[in-house]
């Protein structure tokens, strides 16, 4: 089979913070991103990590069923959660526990879900979140049209 070129171009790297945590002066800090908001978001990440560690401990001692850890996803979930509007819907994957809590799903519902109880997927009215989808990649199809 003859060879053919399938890509020509360049890939750019965007770095907002340098290695010392300083913001690039050309880019600057996004409007509305205050120190207070950053601290609030950081506290959310810490809470998600503590929640996750507790859930993992429960799972490893046989007190919780299958559980997919969110470790390493905290910042992405907080960033997305804070960027979403109140009317936006979340179609979570199996590692989106933090994002679900930001959207109004109580932590005990998430634990109930991972213990195999369908009541863990019943959320209060006004919580725009579908139940967790475990199959990888199915969220896009489920979210289409919401």
Enumerate the language-model features and the residues they cover.
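Active-site-adjacent structural elements in enzyme catalytic domains
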Residues: 37-38, 47, 75
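A generic structural signal for short, non-catalytic loop/turn and secondary-structure boundary residues
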Residues: 7-10, 38-40, 83-85
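N-terminal glycine-rich anion-binding loops that anchor highly charged ligand groups
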Residues: 15-21, 43-56
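N-proximal short alpha-helices
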Residues: 10-14, 49, 115
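Short, contiguous, helix-prone interaction/anchoring segments in small proteins
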Residues: 32-43
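Cofactor-binding active-site loop characterized by glycine-rich and histidine/acidic residues
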Residues: 50-53, 57-146
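Charged, compositionally biased N-terminal leader segments and the immediate start
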Residues: 1-29
């Amino acid at each position: 089979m003859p060879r053919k070129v399938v890509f020509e171009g360049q890939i750019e790297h965007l770095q907002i913070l340098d290695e010392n945590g300083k913001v690039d002066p050309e880019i600057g800090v996004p409007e509305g991103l205050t120190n207070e908001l950053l601290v609030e978001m950081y506290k959310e990440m810490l809470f998600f990590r503590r929640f996750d560690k507790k859930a993992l401990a429960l799972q490893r001692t046989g007190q919780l069923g299958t559980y997919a850890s969110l470790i390493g996803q905290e910042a992405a979930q907080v960033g997305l959660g804070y960027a979403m509007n109140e009317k936006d819907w979340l179609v979570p994957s199996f590692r989106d526990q933090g994002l679900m809590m930001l959207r109004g799903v109580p932590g005990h519902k998430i634990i109930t879900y991972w213990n195999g109880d369908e009541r863990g997927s019943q959320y209060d009215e006004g919580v725009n979140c579908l139940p967790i989808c475990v199959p990888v990649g199915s969220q896009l199809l489920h979210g289409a049209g919401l």
